[in-house]
A protein has these predicted regions:
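Midchain, well-structured core segments that form catalytic/ion-binding scaffolds
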Residues: 1-148
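An extended, acidic, His-containing surface patch that forms the Zn2+-binding/catalytic region
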Residues: 84-297
């Protein structure tokens, strides 16, 4: 139900400067059973990939929590309606099911357990995460986070069903060029100049897009989100500073405007991957050179 509400939901696309991200996509769904048994799975997990142009990590975790609440409400209502029908069919007295909607972010669960158990919990969960990484350094980052949450759940007294929303994978920061700073203005102006100079050598018009719609190393060259948003990211990432490290200060020490002047092609990362030779090996180097030269004036 949660996947139905999130996956390919265009209401969750992020629009900025006239460009729209693709909607969230489900990357994996699984229960915790190691093999086949006739027992109903007690727990499950799902990964969703969010693409952002202007949304912060705080915005994303808020969206996930709201969708989790909606999904939980729907499932509880559906279960009660189905159970009511079954009781009628079986001539059994219907009693409303005891389950209620219960959704946490990882930060909320962590705070609740800290308030109840104090330093005993925080020390235990930190040592657990640290030792888990030392014993299984190659463990997938997402599975690492799940194991940390499983361990924390042992400290929860109320074992009734719940959803925990968290950040499980690496953080590829959004890069938004607005032209609001002098450096951004200069870079955008230099790019425009290089395009005008090279355009007459191209068969097709060169179009500037304000966002690179894929994963790029440029995400580690600047930070468009504020520090508070990054703190929200860390507080909702079980692997933060035990297995996964994102040095905000290092990124901020660079913090330069970024553009991607790259090749044009098709079927990236496939056996049929290919590029437009003239554009890639002539136009792109020329635009890169002219952009740099213009910036150095």
């Amino acid at each position: 139900e949660l996947t139905r509400l999130i996956e390919l939901n265009t209401d969750l696309c992020d629009e900025a400067q006239g460009e729209v991200t693709i909607p969230p996509i489900s990357l994996k769904q699984s229960d915790f059973k190691e093999g086949y048994t006739v027992q109903t799975a007690l727990a499950a997990y799902a990964y969703y990939n969010f693409f952002t142009h202007s949304m912060s990590p705080a915005d994303v975790i808020d969206i996930c929590k709201k969708k989790a609440i909606e999904a939980f409400d729907n499932v509880v209502n559906y279960a009660n309606e189905s159970y009511k029908k079954y009781c009628k069919m079986s001539n059994v007295e219907y009693t409303k099911l005891p389950w209620k909607t219960r959704v946490y972010t990882w930060e909320e669960l962590y705070v609740e357990l800290t308030e109840k158990h104090g330093g005993k919990f925080t020390k235990h969960i930190y040592n657990f995460a640290k030792e888990l990484n030392e014993k299984q350094p190659t463990l997938d980052l997402r599975l690492f986070s799940i194991k940390v949450i499983e361990e924390a759940w042992k400290w929860v007294e109320d074992k009734s069903p719940a959803i925990v929303a968290f950040f499980g994978s690496i953080f590829s920061a959004r890069i938004e060029m607005t032209g609001k700073t002098e450096k951004e203005k200069n870079l955008l102006s230099a790019v425009d100049y290089s395009i005008k100079e090279v355009q007459n050598q191209c068969e097709n018009p060169i179009k500037v897009r304000m966002f690179y719609p894929y994963i790029s190393d440029s995400s580690f060259m600047a930070l468009s989100d504020d520090v508070d948003s990054i703190e929200t990211l860390g507080k909702n990432m079980p692997s933060w500073k035990t297995k996964y490290f994102y040095d905000v200060e290092d990124v901020l020490s660079v913090n330069v405007p970024v553009v991607n002047i790259g090749s044009f092609g098709k079927d990236g990362h496939k056996i049929t991957e290919r590029v437009h030779m003239k554009y890639t090996f002539e136009n792109v180097p020329n635009m890169s050179y002219l952009t740099i030269r213009e910036l150095l004036k």
